[in-house]
Curated annotation (Swiss-Prot):
InterPro entries: EFG_II (IPR041095), EFG_III (IPR009022), EFG_III/V (IPR035647), EFG_IV (IPR047872), EFG_V (IPR035649), EFG_V-like (IPR000640), EFTu-like_2 (IPR004161), G_TR_CS (IPR031157). The keyword Repeat does not apply. Residues 8-290 form the tr-type G domain. One of its GO terms (molecular function) is guanosine tetraphosphate binding. This is Elongation factor G. GO terms for cellular component: cytoplasm. SUPFAM superfamilies: EF-G C-terminal domain-like, P-loop containing nucleoside triphosphate hydrolases, Ribosomal protein S5 domain 2-like, Translation proteins. HAMAP family: EF_G_EF_2_B. Pfam families: EFG_C, EFG_III, EFG_IV, GTP_EFTU, GTP_EFTU_D2.
Amino acid sequence: MARTTPISLYRNIGISAHIDAGKTTTTERILFYTGVSHKIGEVHDGAATMDWMEQEQERGITITSAATTAFWSGMSQQFPQHRINVIDTPGHVDFTIEVERSMRVLDGAVMVYCAVGGVQPQSETVWRQANKYKVPRIAFVNKMDRTGANFLRVVEQIKTRLGGNAVPLQLPIGAEDNFKGVVDLIKMKAINWNEADQGMTFTYEDIPAEMLAECEKWRANLVEAAAESSDELMDKFFSGDELTEEEIKKGLRLRALKTEIILVTCGSAFKNKGVQAMLDAVIDYLPAPTDIEAIKGINPDETEGERHASDDEPFAALAFKIATDPFVGNLTFFRVYSGVVESGATVLNSVKDKRERFGRIVQMHANKREEIKEVRAGDIAAAIGLKDVGTGDTLCAMDAPIILERMEFPEPVISVAVEPKTKADQEKMGLALGRLAQEDPSFRVHTDEESGETIISGMGELHLDIIVDRMRREFKVEANIGKPQVSYRETIRTRVNDVEGKHAKQSGGRGQYGHVVIDLYPLEPEGPGYEFVNEIKGGVIPGEYIPAVDKGIQEQLKSGPLAGYPVVDLGVRLHFGSYHDVDSSELAFKLAASLAFKAAFNKANPVLLEPIMKVEVETPPDYVGDVIGDLSRRRAMVSGQEANEFVVKINAEVPLAEMFGYATDLRSQTQGRASYSMEPLKYAEAPKNVADAVIEARKK
């Protein structure tokens, strides 16, 4: 089969935003205008096409990032037909993992902001993730029809809060109830969408006279931004010559692709205005797969390799999401970076070094699927029937193995114990949790060795609620949930030298003998977490036993002497010891090392670390006193506030242990008018009274 759409006409984009900026509605409109769905799905009647898990429709929030293919030839049919693969990403901070994961496989992003709320906490998290993966982006200021909508305020916030060089491509005509349409600053024409056909058609009109001066000012700003893309355009600009529409677009595209500027569009997805022009901007200013750098990877011989976006290179793809589908089982979403693969082909999972066979390949449209015979460079599709592929694994040609960059996933910060309600649920629960953990790398399952309980850990209360909810719905497992537990850590504050550990057992027959002397010292947080330095001189401990010493200590790190929590940020220097020709063994040295470690740890001023969250609360001004008072009771350090007439933003650092149930408390303090977001910030030493209580509770 030949390629149907040239790769230069592909756009792989993500749509991401704060939880209520109207992102799913925006995506729905994209599907409507590109002719994929004939009836617009509204989020508030639970019919949105992209939100296809039952829970999403109930809660009105997007949980799983669905990938959808759409086609667009421009509002005036001015482009050849482009293929847009849209990845809808969740906006709730408990699901940042989904956002991070989709950023990894996108080429460009549309950031949706609410014209009233502006740049909200989650927008900043998403922005940082887009920076991390150098994703070019444009902004869409949505909800221009809402009371309090202010386009230029949001443009200003993109500059001040996100550090983005925001350049408006359009200005809104009117706002709130009077929002009529937008002015295209390149064409200097007003765009008026036809309400009778839900904005499918439009007319260009003259700019309202009272807006002309403002439009000219912002157009000059736009043209200057375009001119700065090259010396040639700069010369033309300064000599007073008009830049052509083509030159302006070319200049803006160059700078947008280098992430030097963020072009800003606006509209109201709900009122069917603006999304159409934003789609044109996606094609004009966001990259095709061929516009971005080749993806880097590691060859089998550990040298660096790369793959270009071309059908002629060997096949390489990255699995970025595993979803369980009620009809076909596991769906593995993957992005093809190079080459071609047909359904039925055998490929290599280079991360696990296992062969996999592509059973069927489907192109997803929200939760409808179309079976296809092959996929090519630039495509995003889902495979059915892969056996052992996890998120972040590479699938590649058998004869050209490469491991593409791995994704890094955050450590969970909150855990709860779950127990099945009946014996019959027991087995199903293990299966369900295993399946869910495979889908979501930020969710972990383990069994507590002492209590035998099953512990699940995740990124926040909502995250775990949804996991338990999915267990009930999709796997029909009823479970009881324990109280949330905080993931504490242990570390040391002072260095101790020359601590010895000796394991000697001589009781007839072959004995056991291992003897080590170590120093223990603290490491900086954010570093490697653990280091082992071997400074044994003159063979006082034979080389073959050194790894056993390291291993003995590492096993102790899993469950620290203070309260059984993982130990972090310390180094061990092994510098002396002794051995016995007959009685020494790896096991003896492992045991000696663990004895030395425990003794040294207890002398090194051990402390308990607790996770601190970065919390941002947005509240109407009337409730600020109550909110801050409540945060102080939760041991918060309030680091600042910003206010406008509608809302006060309070930034604080709060121990996670104090944040349980906060959503409910905040609702009752502010009659449901405040919202908050939190994300893990760091670990910090717990105050003595808190640490003592935690240690005491663990002894029971």
